């Protein structure tokens, strides 16, 4: 399975309108495309950073959707008041403990490793990091995506609410530090978001 993420530095006053547009207009439009699994959107109201991610059954389906998605993406970016930055990923891990509800939050970590070391990073996340992440209070789900060409990866952990995410911060840092050290990877940034749209629907993959 594959994913396309669109990051927009939004006008903070436009975030609610943008999230509503993604939920009410973008999602129904994308559902008409072959191979779509689902869509999610995360927002950071303090910084204005928003990330929408569409998931696809195959890389071919993701690539085939590019032209049709562009106009939809550009309209969403216009409403949010920012320019879209697009990245493509392979979804290599998806694990859910239970569904998310209103108020759910997500912590993401962007990682970098050598292109030839991506499989080792995936294995470390799957066998060493994920079992510990599952033990965090308020844990809902976790995913891991990679771009093999660039050596980039993104881990995402979803929590029931902001209080659970806040309480997990120090323990999550220890897990992340141990995992990246073991895999010889570096952390590019760590961000925390509100889960504004939750319709990703990616099947279990561990």
What kind of region is each of these model predictions?
Residues 1-51, 57-206:
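Short S/T/G/P-rich N-terminal loop/turn motif that feeds into the first structured element of a domain
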